[in-house]
């Protein structure tokens, strides 16, 4: 238990390592979060602690494990780190999200509206779920680089769990910096409130909860 003379620990936020296409969102997020007093780990800004005896994957996943809060951003780029010889390999960004969910990290999530629109359209065309989408051949584009972005969104909202069991499934839609910035501002300017929440609910480690099924 912290005494009156102890200096409060600075809260650390890990921002998911997606970069391409949302640079302005990341810049705005970094400026806002640092202005509120958080230590921000963001690969885009070079502020994520890295060590030369670890791979890029390991450095990013270790950041997720050690941070206090995870800010996940699902953009239109699936991310790097995919093994071209293994069609089932996942990007760093996807693995970060899964790690945050597995650890039940206190998290806030943003998803580009292109991802949500594409999911809705494909569902109406009879391509609901990861297995159905995996049969499709999507041409890479700036609109939506990879259909596994939809998989990420569905994992974030716990799509496979019964509605009554879904907790921590709020995902905010955004299109650009003008949409993302107000959400980040309204959520994270409550520094003391968030610190108290973490102290109350996570001081003995994250609670156990039902996990989203992986495809």
Give the residues covered by each predicted segment.
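Conserved catalytic or regulatory cores that recognize and/or transform ribose-phosphate-containing ligands
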Residues: 1-215
């Amino acid at each position: 238990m912290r005494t009156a003379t102890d200096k409060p620990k600075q809260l650390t936020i890990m921002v998911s390592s997606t970069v391409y296409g949302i640079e302005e969102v990341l810049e705005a997020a970094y400026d806002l979060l640092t202005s509120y007093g958080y230590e921000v780990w963001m690969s885009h800004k070079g502020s994520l602690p890295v060590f030369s005896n670890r791979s890029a994957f390991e450095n990013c996943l270790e950041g997720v494990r050690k941070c206090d809060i995870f800010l996940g951003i699902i953009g239109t780029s699936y991310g790097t780190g995919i093994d071209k010889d293994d069609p089932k390999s996942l990007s760093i960004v996807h693995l970060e999200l899964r790690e945050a969910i597995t650890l039940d990290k206190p998290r806030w999530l943003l998803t580009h509206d292109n991802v949500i629109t594409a999911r809705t359209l494909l569902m109406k065309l009879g391509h609901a779920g990861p297995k159905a989408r995996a049969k499709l051949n999507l041409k890479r584009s700036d609109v939506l680089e990879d259909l596994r972005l939809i998989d990420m969104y569905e994992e974030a909202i716990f799509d496979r769990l019964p509605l009554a069991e879904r907790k921590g499934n709020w995902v905010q839609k955004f299109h650009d910096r003008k949409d993302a910035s107000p959400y980040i501002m309204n959520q994270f300017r409550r520094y003391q409130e968030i610190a108290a929440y973490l102290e109350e609910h996570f001081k003995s480690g994250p609670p156990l909860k039902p996990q989203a099924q992986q495809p």
